[in-house]
Amino acid sequence: MQRAKAVEGSVGTSTVANMMNRDHMRAFFRRTAALVAFVALLWAVHLLNWIIGYGLNPAFGLIPRHVSGLDGVIAMPLLHGSFAHLMANTLPLLVMGGLLVATTTRALLPVNAVMIGLGGGLVWRFGSSAIHIGASGLVFGWFGFLVARGLVDRSPITLGAALVVGVLYGSLLWGVFPGQPGVSWEAHLFRALAGAAAAFLVRTHVHVPRLGGVDLD
């Protein structure tokens, strides 16, 4: 009788674990779909922007210390100056965004809110008097978050993600220094700092789905 109850309890626990794992997988695919949809939105907005002669950039770009430029805090990542500009940001967005959605199952919205709000606010307050556009600030923000989170959490997963972005995109750090014509180094710097701050301010839950019944933690 006791053995039967033990087996029954084990089966019940296994069933619950499998259900939780399926929930995590579904959430992962939803987040991945959202990431792909976001990148597709960037291309759709840019196509429209190109058709109208890039009129969206002065209308919705971030203009430091101008009230009319405050909407750029949110709209800035959606706007680009050319197809080459957007193409240069697309792959890093997919790679770092993929690492983000694969290793962070909670607090994604707060993390991005801190990064976009704080980083964009600092650009608006301290940035140069120009129209700041582009998703590269978002790339730097995710870079800062992934690296800082690895140092904060020190789990194998977060350290692995930090190592991957460090190896693949460590050269990005040159982008936080001034002196590059036409480059919003302020957006790079402040978004990266905001992403790092998000790693300290927002606790995230790390989970890797089980494959074939084996944990990949």
Cite the ranges covered by each PLM segment.
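A detector for small-residue-rich transmembrane helices and their helix-helix packing motifs
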Residues: 2-217
